[in-house]
Amino acid sequence: MANDQMAAQMSGKGGFIAALDQSGGSTPGALRLYGIAESAYSGEAEMFRLMHEMRVRMITSPAFNGDKVIAAILFERTMDGLAQGKPVPTFLWEERGVVPFLKVDKGLEAEADGVSLMKPMPDLDPLLARAAKLGVYGTKMRSVINLASKTGVAAIARQQFEIGEQIARHGLMPILEPEVSIKSPDKAGAEALLLAELTKGLDALPADRQVMFKLTLPETPDFYAPLIKDKRVARVVALSGGYTRADACKRLAANHGMIASFSRALAQDLRQSMSDAEFNVALASAIDEIYRASVVKV
C-alpha cells in the first residue's frame, strides 16, 4: 500500500523535505527572489499562476526526485494543480518517489504574549478530506514564538497538538511547526520552554499516534535529540528560518538525526530567466548541499 511505503520513507529514509508552500502573503517575495517583479503581473490569479509555473519547473526538474528529496510540502493551489498532466500529489509520488504534504494553516494571528498563534481554520475538515483523496500523506501548519513566554509557548504547543489530533482523524500525518524566531532576544530560553511543552504534548497522545515536528535550528546542537529518539515522533525536520543556505546547512549538520525542510534556502539561486539547463544545475546544486547537511553530520 502506498501509505505504508510513504510512512517508511518519512520515518527512515535519508534525504530532506522540500518546502514548496508559499501562501498568498509570502508569494510576492518568492517571485521577486525568482526574478519576477510585482509590476510583471496584476491580480492574485496571475500571481498564483506564475508561482505554480515555478513550482512545476522545480518538481519536474531531473534532480527533484526521491533519491534526495523524500517529501514536498505543497500550498493548496499547488496540490490542486497539474504537473505533466497529472495531479501534483500523484505526479510527485508516482513519477518522482516524493511524498506529498499539504500546508493547511491560514496564517498567523497578531502577536500576543510573545507568540503568534494560527488563525482559525473553519474549513479544515473538508480540506483534509480532499487532500486525503488526492493522495496527500500529511500536513504542515506553522505558528511563531518570538519571546520566551511560558504561557505563550504553552498556548502554541496546545494549539498545534489539538489541531494535529483533528488532522490525524483523517488518517494524515501532521507536521507540527512551532517556529522559534531566529530574531528572538532569548532564543535558547524559548527553545527550552518549547521542548518541555512538546514533551508534555507527546505524553498526552493516544498510544498508537505519531507526529512530526518542524523546528527552528536550535542554539545548542542536538538540543532536540530527546524528540528525535521518541517513538511517538516519526521525524524531526528543520526550517531555515531566514538563515542563508550556507548557515542553515552548517547548523543542520551539527544536529544529528534532524533533516532539512527548507523553502527559501532551496530556491534562493533559481531565476526565471535561466535556461532549463542552468536552472537544473542550480537546483541540483542546492539539493546536493541540503541533502549533505541532512545526512552527513559533524
Enumerate the language-model features and the residues they cover:
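Internal active-site segments that recognize and position negatively charged phosphoryl groups
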Residues: 144-147, 152-166, 172
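Short, electropositive alpha-helical surface patch
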Residues: 153-163, 190-200, 228-235
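Short amphipathic alpha-helical patches
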Residues: 154-155, 187-190, 290, 294
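Glycine-rich, often proline-containing surface loops adjacent to acidic residues and nearby aromatics
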Residues: 135-143, 172-179
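Surface-exposed cleft-lining segments at the edges of enzyme active sites
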Residues: 110-115, 139-154, 181-187
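Aromatic-anchored, glycine/proline-accented short structural segments
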Residues: 163, 167-217
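Alpha/beta catalytic barrel-like cores
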Residues: 1-137, 145-147, 197, 201-215, ...
